[in-house]
Amino acid sequence: MSQPPPPPPLPPPPPPPEAPQTSSSLAAAATPGGLSKRRDRRILSGSCPDPKCQARLFFPASGSVSIECTECGQRHEQQQLLGVEEVTDPDVVLHNLLRNALLGVTGAPKKNTELVKVMGLSNYHCKLLSPILARYGMDKQTGRAKLLRDMNQGELFDCALLGDRAFLIEPEHVNTVGYGKDRSGSLLYLHDTLEDIKRANKSQECLIPVHVDGDGHCLVHAVSRALVGRELFWHALRENLKQHFQQHLARYQALFHDFIDAAEWEDIINECDPLFVPPEGVPLGLRNIHIFGLANVLHRPIILLDSLSGMRSSGDYSATFLPGLIPAEKCTGRDGHLNKPICIAWSSSGRNHYIPLVGIKGAALPKLPMNLLPKAWGVPQDLIKKYIKLEEDGGCVIGGDRSLQDKYLLRLVAAMEEVFMDKHGIHPSLVADVHQYFYRRTGVIGVQPEEVTAAAKKAVMDNRLHKCLLCGALSELHVPPEWLAPGGKLYNLAKSTHGQLRPDKNYSFPLNNLVCSYDPVKDVLLPDYGLSNLTACNWCHGTSVRRVRGDGSIVYLDGDRTNSRSTGGKCGCGFKHFWEGKEYDNLPEAFPITLEWGGRVVRETVYWFQYESDPSLNSNVYDVAMKLVTKHFPGEFGSEILVQKVVHTILHQTAKKNPDDYTPVNIDGAHAQRIGDVQGQELESQLPTKIILTGQKTKTLHKEELNMSKTERTIQQNITEQASVMQKRKTEKLKQEQKGQPRTVSPSTIRDGPSSAPATPTKAPYSPTTSKEKKIRITTNDGRQSMVTLKSSTTFFELQESIAREFNIPPYLQCIRYGFPPKELMPPQAGMEKEPVPLQHGDRITIEILKGKAEGGPSTAAHSAHTVRQEEIAVTGKLSSKELQEQADKEMYSLCLLATLMGEDVWSYAKGLPHMFQQGGVFYNIMKKTMGMADGKHCTFPHLPGKTFVYNASEDRLELCVDAAGHFPIGPDVEDLVKEAVSQVRAEATTRSRESSPSHGLLKLGSGGVVKKKSEQLHNVTAFQGKGHSLGTASSNPHMDPRARETLAVRKHNTGTDFSNSSIKTEPPVFTAASSNSELIRIAPGVVTMRDGRQIDPDVVEAQRKKLQEMVSSIQASMDKHLRDQSTEQTPSDLSQRKVEAVSSSVRPGNLQTGLPESFSLTGGTENLNTETTDSRVADVLGAAFATRSKAQKENSMEEPEEMDSQDAETTNTTEPMDHS
């Protein structure tokens, strides 16, 4: 199935609505490449197939074959979506969506790997529940959680019960980010190993590395996922491991006394604790001894794999960990067979992150071939056959087929959630959302779950937590405490406005959505979050934000759309609506009613429900009437008559001639798409709640961008109008702050490679004051190894001496490497010889023996390392530049598409959005990336043909450049300003001198930016060098009037029209032929330009030069003929005098509209010959000047340089007077 070609920059608008399609045609619509161009532009909708999500998704029929759900974060194939149907009226949706995208209205942040939900569960959610699962179980009868000791199962969950379980991933989840295949680089690192496994399994992919979070617990996360598919048992595994080591410490010490010192066991046991915080100088991270312990805890083998090169090395990077301390008969499942091994692996050469390898549900169980089965670790090799059932070919089956059912897992999670709510007063899913929106999105990493839980609980109790009904993001109403204290922003504002603050008054700050009271004792303002309300979402800026309760439920207002799906009704949005504590399929209809009793007249509005799928929710006319009468006339005698009248009135109002008439009350925020926005068009059966545009340049746009009420439009318009002023102020402020602060490159910003999970075994920063001794394992490249104890103050040279004593290797032959990946330990710099080495307890260093090398070797190695570092910096910069380019492509493509939908060209639409030409705007960014920003620098954009722009540094923006009138700020009325300025220039052209003619002053547009006036340029300028030069008009006649030459020099810098509009034609192919060596830059899909206009193909320069020669030769020939015709009537002396007079008169102010050809402009990737024309009289004068000059050069070989006027020192060929080569 071939992918469709990428969309052009300016696609045509969507087609008119079509008739509803059949199910078969809709299925075909979801397949790219199977439809005509007309149908490929349709927008389809479908539901997420996850039963816990089922969000409505909208996507173009010609887009990507996979769709990412913006609710749960999973990515699904189009054919997997449920209920695929065509959206017949996407115009308004696309308009609002693209407009919001261009205005920078972002949706909720994309879910990271911890927050992607599968079956309603995210990784972070499971981590929060894991401590509870270590102490609680689920009663099979009631499905409720109970303490394990109350169920007579001990204090701690026995992980051996999971010894025969194995996780098999569903095929549809293999590519789900954060749940399926690992994306930290392991697929490349383990490629050869996985290929060998694939060949051993009949070339079928049946064992894949899957994701686990790198938060310091990756080993137990990997084991937990290999067992049950979730990170639910990491806490129990750590506690089981610690208890196991404590109970069997004597056996472990006896077994590993040759490998592990007795003093190390205390650290090994402490590292198993879930809350372990390492002391200074002690590494954090579970090691091989812990994997061996886990194998004994689970009563099953654990196989650790590595890349093929790592498995073949002498290091113990791969091994088979057998439950050697457990009798083999206890390592069996319920069927009596040995528990099959589970498999984990290193994810990279750094060997600092474990990942599990699991099988695929529905495929054959994976088999590990004999050549990949590592040696047993810590026990005799013959025990492998005792604990692992080997196949006939020597391999073994991984995992098994006894998986924990999803239904049971979800029931278990639901039971544990109740315990979490009882313990903390807040739902774990709400804590997970707080972590996502308030910590991860702001760059705060490593915060303990207990701290996040406490912060979330306090925010709920203070009524500061709000949820957006449009994008689902959490927002916090938070004000810095320092703003409320004396000297703070809000405190000073209240005092300057109200004078002396009083404790019996409330002070409102509308811009901060805050109401405060005053505490005279502490002299501070106290925020009252009960009276304060957040008015807009911090992420999508939508106005439908509501408070959140501790259980995760939302405090809805009447009319709000809830998350409950609606199966019927006339509303059309697909969701139920909240009204007076209940959820309805439809919004109510509203009509006025008048009550008259006892001389009183009361007007009231009745809200009527009539089309509910649950009949009990439909309004009862007698109940409604009784409530109205009781509300306004309580206890009135004889009010039953009034009730009867009200009943008749309501029945009359609700009795419709057409049962399909449905006019619900209009409430902002009730639907993703407003009824008023449709403008009388027929509503589709299910209005979009979100839409996803995908394709070659994937951009996800969220449902909140489809929802714009009148209030939102007003706010957005105000933002747009004030954007330029605010950007200017912010820019000036940043400039002031950045003055005197040189830009530095932080080494921490340079990464070794892409990784979706941080390294797990982190080490505490080294401190030379550490009092503990450090035990370092040293290995040499010839196979020797030893454990060396170093003091905390050991220096580099003392380390070298220790190595020399231990291995008899002279210091000058030692190349010491440490860390993962190994890096060379360099000698200290001068003056720092007494500094301790940066080695920590438990580190392993390798010694490379330098054969036949002098002591100068380390300097060479340092130079090599420096070179590699520079290469890494270059690669990092390249990646960053690529990301910026892709962002500019997306914005430019959206702009072109939106302009087409609005029926305008790009310039007509873009000039109405001036912020695009200011800092942060798409055109500003393109110029900044492509050419760089310099005051007065000009540029053009392929999407805005015929327009030239100039950068104004004082205002920090791009302005429209009109040669004859000057520079103008971009705005909706810029064309009117240009016309007015041009007409004014034309009116003044006859009354003022040419020296004051409106132009760029002394500067003109050139290929590299700015070209100086002719009189200021250097002599002998080469064509197309980026400097302007004219065709040359200074006569070589020494008797010419000097005033005439001076006037010519002044006139030459003025701007004129292009030669392409005159009788002299230029061929476009000559100027668009780009050099193969030129650096092409893509600034939008399908559009390329050149980074520097000066890098032009010499062939193009030669072609342009020849055309200039032909042009001048034609003018000269015409003039020679004219002179021959007049030679019979005039004497040679008269002819010379007439030529001088002609040149003098032709350059007087007011006689010419344009000057002489001067500069060549190469911008925007298209080479344009920007020269200037004259009328026929000027052409004749030019010819006369050239002829006179040619003759004068023949007669006088010596000429003053200033009279050459940028021509060559000598003209060697009279037929080519303009040869500038």
UniProtKB/Swiss-Prot annotation:
Per UniProt, the enzyme's principal EC class comes to: hydrolase
* Phosphoserine found at: S746, S756, S767, S993, S997, S1076, S1197, S1206
* Cysteine disulfide partners in this protein: none
Q: What is the effect of changing C218 to A/S?
A: Loss of deubiquitinating activity and ability to promote VCP-mediated Golgi membrane fusion
Q: Which PANTHER family match?
A: DEUBIQUITINATING PROTEIN VCIP135, DEUBIQUITINATING PROTEIN VCPIP1
Q: What EC identifiers does the entry list?
A: 3.4.19.12
Q: Which residues form the active site?
A: D215, C218 (nucleophile), H353
What gene does this protein come from? Vcpip1
| Sections of the chain in a coiled coil | none
Please list the residue ranges annotated as the OTU domain. 207-360
Q: Which organism is it from?
A: Rattus norvegicus
> Which ranges are annotated Low complexity under compositional bias?
754-770, 1162-1173
Assembly information from the UniProt record: Binds VCP and the ternary complex containing STX5A, NSFL1C and VCP.
InterPro entries the record matches = OTU1_Ubl, OTU_dom, Ubiquitin-like_domsf, VCPIP1, VCPIP1_N
Tissue-specificity statement: Widely expressed.
Signal peptide span: none
One Gene Ontology term of the molecular function aspect: cysteine-type deubiquitinase activity
- Residue ranges, annotated region (Disordered): 1-40, 724-778, 988-1009, 1117-1177, 1189-1221
Q: A single GO CC term, please?
A: endoplasmic reticulum
Function according to Swiss-Prot or TrEMBL: Deubiquitinating enzyme involved in DNA repair and reassembly of the Golgi apparatus and the endoplasmic reticulum following mitosis. Necessary for VCP-mediated reassembly of Golgi stacks after mitosis. Plays a role in VCP-mediated formation of transitional endoplasmic reticulum (tER). Mediates dissociation of the ternary complex containing STX5A, NSFL1C and VCP.
- Compositional bias ranges of the Pro residues kind: 1-19
Q: What protein name applies here?
A: Deubiquitinating protein VCPIP1
Listed under catalytic activity are:
Thiol-dependent hydrolysis of ester, thioester, amide, peptide and isopeptide bonds formed by the C-terminal Gly of ubiquitin (a 76-residue protein attached to proteins as an intracellular targeting signal)
* Residues modified to Phosphothreonine: T762
Principal location: nucleus
Segments crossing the lipid bilayer: none
